[in-house]
Curated annotation (Swiss-Prot):
UniProt protein name: Uncharacterized protein ML0493
Residues engaged in binding Zn(2+) 2: D61, H62, D158, H199
InterPro entries attached to this UniProt entry: MBL_Glyoxalase_II, Metallo-B-lactamas, RibonucZ/Hydroxyglut_hydro
EC number: 3.-.-.-
UniProt organism field: Mycobacterium leprae (strain TN)
PANTHER family to which the protein is assigned, alphabetical: HYDROXYACYLGLUTATHIONE HYDROLASE GLOC (PTHR46233:SF3)
Keyword Amino-acid biosynthesis on entry: no
Gene3D superfamilies xref list: Ribonuclease Z/Hydroxyacylglutathione hydrolase-like
Length: 218
């Protein structure tokens, strides 16, 4: 499987591109600020055609370029219904600091939006099959995407990071829900599963089970 990514924009959100191989359909996850340029290069170099934009949640650093990518390539954007309102209001509850940075930015929904309204759903997106788990805690509509490959991969957004977990002090956040999501949806995965988080370095489920101080005793 072809998996690559890059940190996008000021807030350094990891944008990922997944495909079975070069020359096939591709899935784009969390295209943040100024993602179009790097995405075009990756798609062109690997002869990839986007089949979907997947959003782990609706915060601005993860969805900034979703509408542009989706409408440019004519593919749908997938988001949980609890976070759909953030496609047009991604700063809701995000705090004044970020609002000042993006003053004047205008957001609208992509022409094609698909709601991820079924927990445990399986999406067949061209060459890639993605399993969707609703993992509220960081936001009410946060989801994780699990992909079976030679080594399984889970894209965790802002739910789980290397040696830390997602913040829960923004609108819709819940510490109780976050821990339940991690325990019931992530720690049940094989230790070798590669974790691709929304920010920072990749890790594995096993490494976080052993070394993440926020998961001690779980």
């Amino acid at each position: 499987m072809l998996i690559t990514g890059f940190p996008a924009g000021m807030l350094q959100c990891n944008c990922y591109v997944l495909a079975d191989r070069a020359g096939t359909d591709a899935v784009i996850v969390d295209p943040g600020q100024r993602a179009m340029g790097p995405l075009r290069r990756i798609l062109d170099e690997n002869r990839l055609t986007p089949s979907a934009v997947l959003l782990t949640h609706g915060h601005i650093d993860h969805m900034w370029s979703a509408q542009k990518v989706s409408d440019t390539y004519g593919c749908p954007t997938y988001i949980h219904p609890e976070d759909r309102f953030m496609l047009t209001d991604p700063l809701f509850g995000f705090g004044p600091r970020v609002a000042q940075v993006v003053t004047g930015a205008f957001f609208r929904e992509p022409k094609q939006v698909v709601e991820l309204d079924r927990d445990g759903d399986k999406l067949d997106l061209g060459s890639v099959t993605v399993n969707v788990d609703h993992t509220p805690g960081h936001t009410r509509g946060s989801v994780c995407f699990w992909v079976a490959a030679d080594t399984d991969v889970v894209l965790t957004g802002d739910t789980l990071f290397e040696r830390t977990i997602g913040r829960t002090d923004l609108f819709g956040g819940s510490g109780r829900d976050l821990y339940r999501s991690i325990v019931e949806k992530l720690l049940v995965l094989d230790d070798k599963t590669v974790v691709l988080p929304g920010h920072g370095n990749s890790t594995t489920i096993g490494a976080e089970r052993r070394f993440n101080p926020f998961l001690e005793g779980l």
